[in-house]
């Protein structure tokens, strides 16, 4: 077995820093999330996409979780403009893609269309409630979508995470250099506690390497900030993982909170990075009570192994059992819940912000120390952030 074939068969490359921008007069302003998507399309992380979705692909993705040609793709990657801006644009036009005054790309407009956002919300997020963060973002966006192939002409400033940004060509090269033929990807927007560590190490027993790929794009206000999380990942890997079996790199996309559909999307992207396997735990990419605990695992049954091209590894909720004296799940532990150390994410965040160290059966003390220090420092600067 060797590293996965890119989704769609070819790793897309839309990078051209020498693009003749002086020939392009029209502009479209990008949101932060669209800027991330632009770069991920351009570098091949979203292969086989070569641009923002046209209406045919958009409709197919929303309704069938496939592109118009049948390729598996579960999340609509779209570029939104206002009605006023849409009047300035026409099919066949080229437009600069601008963020913060800088030009990051160019789109060759192939389609201009008005989506049914309620339908998109209901099918992609399983709800049209504005309380859902993904739905709220969707309805905050302008009402017209522009589709077409892009060219990436400028890379974003990677800031403090620069050492952890890798394009798919780079991760594939690194995995090969490490001698890995099988690689399991792990997506997270949270600190890695003992339960996550347990399932990662279970997966490591059957593959050559682990690609820990935390998301550092836009998340909810109450999610633990990326800078604090990154420090916690580093201290965890330093103290508890074999250094030649783990690779840490960040994922710059925005979080959609689309649950099951986002699990498929996350798997396809990790396939492009070279992963042969992908971990799907309980309520992957979920929020609140919008999705069933294991809906993100069940959704994979809609597709054949061949069209997915990456092997999902499904794990149940794990915990420390005081009777077993170790990490376990209901698959391996016969004891009642009273013996299980389980804390909600909300409870843990509250403990950390109050300087309380969660039990070592839940979180490694080194990780807890980093999180407490980071959160308290942030609270001191922005006390209303809570």
From Swiss-Prot:
Query: What broad class of enzyme is this?
Result: transferase
InterPro entries reported in the protein's UniProt record: ATP-Sase_PUA-like_dom, PUA-like_sf, Rossmann-like_a/b/a_fold, SO4_adenylyltransferase_pro, Sulfurylase_cat_dom, Sulphate_adenylyltransferase
Assigned EC number: 2.7.7.4
Keyword Nucleotide-binding listed? The answer is yes
Query: What Pfam families does UniProt report for this protein, alphabetically?
Result: ATP-sulfurylase (PF01747), PUA_2 (PF14306)
Q: Which UniProt keywords apply?
A: ATP-binding, Nucleotide-binding, Nucleotidyltransferase, Transferase
Q: Which CDD domains match?
A: ATPS
Q: Which reaction does it catalyse?
A: sulfate + ATP + H(+) = adenosine 5'-phosphosulfate + diphosphate
> What does the entry give for GO biological process?
hydrogen sulfide biosynthetic process; sulfate assimilation
Protein family membership? Belongs to the sulfate adenylyltransferase family.
Protein name, per record: Sulfate adenylyltransferase
From which organism does this entry originate? Geobacillus thermodenitrificans (strain NG80-2)
